């Protein structure tokens, strides 16, 4: 290409960038990216470009498109890592492990199970890209989860993405529960409990169960402490305790009995830009894949029908 043509091409790109409005339509974003409009629609249909539909028309926020370009470029901004914090989940843990094995050294996907509220604090400080959370029954998740996010000033930049519904209840040592048992019996002095940290979704769940059955939390005998769902299940499996709040999947993973008490939503909070990051899209693909869906059946207590759907925006 001659210097004259190179100069003209550079001038066209620079002019497109300068003239682009804050919210672009299909024609404008095609001009901005120097691609045809059919390619824009293809990117939208594949969920690969930041876009929103308003009154039947697609709009493309220029700031998010710019970030998407940086993150989609080879070796681009932060394309090689994604950090997940917050609530623990066996299936999400397996998906992260599978993805890390597939990526080898090309990228880093990490998962720190530190509880719902601490996870949101870490997300707000930008020490994590994604926060996994659960906070009460599925029927109230669209009120409770956004309310948690609104406790942070950064919530205006966040969205909530549904991973799945999980069956919540009590994880029990084998043989502890029989057909004629009652929840009240689990609060007798001889039954040993795993304590969870404040701010954990499972601890919140336990408080509601205690209130519903008009029990006294002081009656519990605590012999172990856990900071994640799987740690609590491990404490029971290794004989340190008899009961802990948790999901069916964690109980199944560690060979425990399970007392079902309801379903909850398990969501991911993140900025809009992260949702379109290549690594995050890859994580959703792994969760939809045959191996993770097989594991969901093995563990039990999962409903993955809404996986990847955006359920709330600020």
Give the role of each language-model region.
Residues 77-78, 94-172, 176:
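N-terminal segment of the mature folded domain
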Residues 22, 154-169, 252, 256-285, ...:
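Periplasmic-binding protein-like
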Residues 135-149, 233-262:
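A ligand-binding cleft/hinge motif common to bilobed small-molecule-binding domains
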Residues 163, 172-193:
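Flexible hinge/capping segments at coil-to-helix
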